[in-house]
Structures are given as structure tokens and as C-alpha cells.
Swiss-Prot record:
Pathway: Cofactor biosynthesis; coenzyme A biosynthesis; CoA from (R)-pantothenate: step 4/5. It is found in: Cytoplasm. Gene3D superfamilies: HUPs. GO terms for molecular function: ATP binding; pantetheine-phosphate adenylyltransferase activity. The keyword Nucleotide-binding applies. NCBIfam families: coaD_prev_kdtB (TIGR01510), cyt_tran_rel (TIGR00125). Substrate binds at residues 9, 41, 73, 87. Keywords: ATP-binding, Coenzyme A biosynthesis, Cytoplasm, Magnesium, Nucleotide-binding, Nucleotidyltransferase, Transferase. This is Phosphopantetheine adenylyltransferase. Pfam families: CTP_transf_like. Its EC number is 2.7.7.3. It catalyses: (R)-4'-phosphopantetheine + ATP + H(+) = 3'-dephospho-CoA + diphosphate.
Length: 163
């Protein structure tokens, strides 16, 4: 069985993330969407809230499961029996950082490959940070996040209707 781990903070999940997950699910037998506990970022949503959001959004993908982890991503991937890490790329500017991380991960776990998937062009401008900024100021989130996540963001920021 070909297992891949797609790690990230998913704070919140965006349509760009969803695009990468859906395409990874077509390539791998099982995809583990792994929410990282971060000691360096202050998240908007708790781990539990992010896991719940992901479960709602991904429920129709039978070969995708959601989990949380701490520590080194490659260690977690090994524990899951994964042979690949999925990394989404929005633009060339993402590549330098991701390439450096891929080399580091390869040094730590030579048996685990990093697979880069480009998001569709229509999602290339979306990041969790930009989504939070738009939501914070009551802007339109249409096409940026899945509908259930839009509702959660509107509740979180006390927004009403369309931005």
C-alpha cells in the first residue's frame, strides 16, 4: 500500500490545500493529512478545531484520514508507514523553502520521498494567512475556503453575510 503524509498547520484548510489533497488521493492508496503541533506559531484554531474542520471537509474522500502529530515530520511519516511526504506549491517562491526542507528530510529519512504538487492556478494566491486576514476584516471568502470553513471563520470573527 502506498501511503503518503501531507503535513501542515491547516489553520484553516484552504481550497488550495483541498486541491492538493484531492489530487494526492488519486495517486496514493492512503493519504494522511497530518496537523502539526507548532511551538513557533500561534494558531487561530486549536488542534481539535482544525481536525474537526478537516474531517468535515474531507469526509467524502475514503482513502484520506486526518491525524495530529508532534515532533519531526519524517519520524511521524515513518510511524505511519509512509513512503512519501506531500508538499503543495503555490508559486516558484514556495519552492526554495520546500526544496531545502525536502533535502533536510531526505538526510533524516532517505527512504521517504518528497512529492511536490502544484495547486491549480486559481488557488495560487491563497494562503491560510491571507484567508485569516480577509476574514478578520469581513472580506469575501468565496473560492478561498470550503463552505463549512467559511461558516466557521464567519462565526469566529462575528461576520455576517457576504463580504
Amino acid at each position: 500500500m502506498k501511503i503518503a503524509v501531507y503535513p501542515g498547520s491547516f489553520d484553516p484548510i484552504t481550497n488550495g490545500h483541498l486541491d492538493v489533497i484531492q489530487r494526492a488521493a488519486q495517486v496514493f492508496d492512503q493519504v494522511v493529512v497530518a496537523v502539526a503541533h507548532s511551538s513557533t506559531k500561534e494558531p487561530l484554531f486549536s488542534i481539535e478545531e482544525r481536525l474537526d474542520m478537516l474531517r468535515v471537509v474531507l469526509q467524502k474522500l475514503p482513502n484520506v484520514r486526518v491525524d495530529a502529530y508532534r515532533g519531526l515530520t519524517v519520524r511521524y511519516a515513518r510511524e505511519q508507514g509512509a513512503r512519501a511526504l506531500i508538499r503543495g506549491l503555490r508559486a516558484v517562491s514556495d519552492f526554495e523553502y520546500e526544496f531545502t526542507m525536502a533535502l533536510t528530510n531526505k538526510k533524516l529519512a532517505p527512504e521517504i520521498e518528497t512529492v511536490f504538487l502544484m495547486t491549480e492556478a486559481k488557488y495560487s494566491f491563497i494562503s491560510s494567512g491571507s484567508v485569516k486576514e480577509v476574514a478578520r476584516y469581513g472580506g469575501c471568502l468565496e473560492d478561498m475556503v470550503p463552505v463549512p470553513v467559511e461558516r466557521i471563520l464567519r462565526d469566529k470573527f462575528g461576520m455576517r453575510g457576504e463580504g
